[in-house]
């Protein structure tokens, strides 16, 4: 979709889960000739991966907890942030504002509503986040990553557009990489990560779980594991004790290539993680973060687990014995992992960033098409499991 150069503002919370999809959209809008600005908080401005062309405007954003005193301070910060966002809008004149959730996105979304600027929210998870729930009734469109979204009211169904989660170009470039050859006597390459901060539970359980595999399978293991820096020495010693070859690190710059080279992934169930797994098509054993808000990581796994592309183990049941059982079931026959990889690949939405950009472009410009076809087939998501009729986003004139 093409058209006159426009200005767009993206607003996202200060974590990679919110910002990485925003960075991907910014790159796509820039490629189409538009001007883009980012609103976030101090944490968000430091997240790696921000495109060089993208200016980051840091504004205050309140945090709210159970303590009423924190609400007072939080509301003051939101009001101050909203006023700062309004001043940015006056000079930048955005055609639309896109929110990716997280409290730092709230002031900008409130300012857009106040100034009658078209706005869109993108929900990365299978449960609508708190800030996006607050804005669902005010925005022009709701872009979702999963066919079914919890905590999204049916009355907002006509706003919903299923686009998927944008992923990095480096990951998308590997979508057509075939599943690595896996034979009955070949290496079983396992990639283990715990998200951007690592996960100590994986460091504690995975080495011992791999050690419980039958000798014929254990001797074929080749492990790559991302750990917290403070866990590296302990985990290295565990693998050495079990005589399992393992490459460990707190950060891998070539993570996308390592994912493409893996036969099996073990890790958390964040939205970006699942989007990348399904983009490349690699089977997984997923351990949802138990303290994730509204248990959204467990909900994130449902589509790919149902399709056969992954297995999910709740953390309270994540023991070395259970992990070994699941790996053995997947790794005993070469075709089992390959079939799971194909199922994961089929869950991928490689055109997510293009479809989201099409949706964003449909607001604020008279030269846009009357109707856009998200995903090529007018894809719609379902709110709270209620099926939503097919349709598309209608043009919004300035």
UniProtKB/Swiss-Prot annotation:
InterPro entries the UniProt entry points to: GlcNAc_MurG (IPR006009), Glyco_trans_28_C (IPR007235), GlycoTrans_28_N (IPR004276)
Top-level class of the enzyme under EC nomenclature: transferase
GO terms under biological process: carbohydrate metabolic process; cell division; cell wall organization; lipid glycosylation; peptidoglycan biosynthetic process; regulation of cell shape
Cellular localisation: Cell inner membrane
Pathway(s): Cell wall biogenesis; peptidoglycan biosynthesis
EC number(s) stated in the UniProt entry for this protein: 2.4.1.227
Keyword Cell cycle: yes
Keywords: Cell cycle, Cell division, Cell inner membrane, Cell membrane, Cell shape, Cell wall biogenesis/degradation, Glycosyltransferase, Membrane, Peptidoglycan synthesis, Transferase
A Pfam cross-reference name: Glyco_tran_28_C
Molecular function via GO: UDP-N-acetyl-D-glucosamine:N-acetylmuramoyl-L-alanyl-D-glutamyl-meso-2,6-diaminopimelyl-D-alanyl-D-alanine-diphosphoundecaprenol 4-beta-N-acetylglucosaminlytransferase activity; undecaprenyldiphospho-muramoylpentapeptide beta-N-acetylglucosaminyltransferase activity
Binding site for UDP-N-acetyl-alpha-D-glucosamine: 15-17, 125, 168, 196, 297
GO cellular component: plasma membrane
Reaction it catalyzes: di-trans,octa-cis-undecaprenyl diphospho-N-acetyl-alpha-D-muramoyl-L-alanyl-D-glutamyl-meso-2,6-diaminopimeloyl-D-alanyl-D-alanine + UDP-N-acetyl-alpha-D-glucosamine = di-trans,octa-cis-undecaprenyl diphospho-[N-acetyl-alpha-D-glucosaminyl-(1->4)]-N-acetyl-alpha-D-muramoyl-L-alanyl-D-glutamyl-meso-2,6-diaminopimeloyl-D-alanyl-D-alanine + UDP + H(+)
Protein task: Cell wall formation. Catalyzes the transfer of a GlcNAc subunit on undecaprenyl-pyrophosphoryl-MurNAc-pentapeptide (lipid intermediate I) to form undecaprenyl-pyrophosphoryl-MurNAc-(pentapeptide)GlcNAc (lipid intermediate II).
NCBIfam families: murG
Similarity comment: Belongs to the glycosyltransferase 28 family. MurG subfamily.
Name of the protein this chain belongs to: UDP-N-acetylglucosamine--N-acetylmuramyl-(pentapeptide) pyrophosphoryl-undecaprenol N-acetylglucosamine transferase
């Amino acid at each position: 979709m093409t058209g006159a150069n426009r200005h767009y503002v993206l607003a996202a919370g200060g974590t990679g889960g919110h910002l990485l999809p925003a960075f991907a959209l910014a790159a796509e809008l820039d490629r189409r000739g538009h001007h883009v600005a980012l609103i976030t908080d101090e944490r968000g401005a430091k997240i790696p991966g921000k495109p060089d062309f993208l200016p980051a405007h840091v504004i205050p954003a309140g945090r709210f907890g159970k303590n009423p005193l924190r609400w007072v301070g939080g509301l003051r910060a939101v009001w101050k942030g909203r006023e700062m966002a309004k001043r940015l809008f006056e000079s930048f004149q955005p055609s639309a504002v896109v929110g990716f959730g997280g409290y730092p996105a709230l002031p900008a979304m409130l300012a857009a509503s106040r100034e009658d600027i078209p706005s869109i929210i993108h929900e990365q998870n299978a449960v609508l986040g708190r800030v996006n729930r607050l804005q669902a009734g005010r925005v022009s469109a709701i872009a979702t990553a999963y066919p079914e979204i919890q905590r999204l009211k049916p009355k907002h169904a006509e706003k919903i557009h299923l686009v998927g989660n944008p992923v990095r170009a480096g990951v998308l470039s590997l979508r057509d990489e075939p599943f690595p050859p896996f034979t009955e006597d070949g290496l079983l390459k396992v990639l283990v990560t715990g998200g951007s901060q690592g996960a100590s539970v994986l460091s504690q359980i995975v080495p011992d779980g791999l050690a419980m595999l039958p000798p014929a399978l254990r001797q074929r293991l080749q492990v790559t594991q991302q750990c917290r820096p403070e866990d590296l020495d302990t985990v290295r010693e565990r693998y050495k004790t079990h005589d399992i070859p393992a490459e460990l690190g707190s950060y891998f710059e070539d993570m996308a290539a390592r994912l493409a080279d893996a036969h099996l992934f073990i890790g958390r169930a964040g939205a970006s993680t699942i989007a990348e797994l399904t983009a490349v098509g690699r089977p997984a054993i997923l351990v949802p973060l138990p303290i994730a808000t509204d248990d959204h990581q467990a909900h994130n796994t449902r589509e790919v687990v149902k399709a056969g592309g992954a297995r999910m183990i709740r953390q309270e049941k994540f023991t070395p014995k259970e992990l070994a059982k699941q790996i053995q079931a997947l790794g005993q026959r070469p075709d089992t992992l390959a079939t799971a990889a194909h199922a994961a690949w089929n869950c991928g939405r490689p055109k997510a960033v293009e479809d989201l950009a099409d949706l964003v472009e449909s607001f604020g410009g008279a030269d846009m098409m009357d109707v856009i076809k998200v995903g090529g087939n007018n894809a719609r998501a379902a709110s709270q499991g209620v099926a939503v009729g097919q349709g598309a986003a209608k043009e919004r004139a300035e």
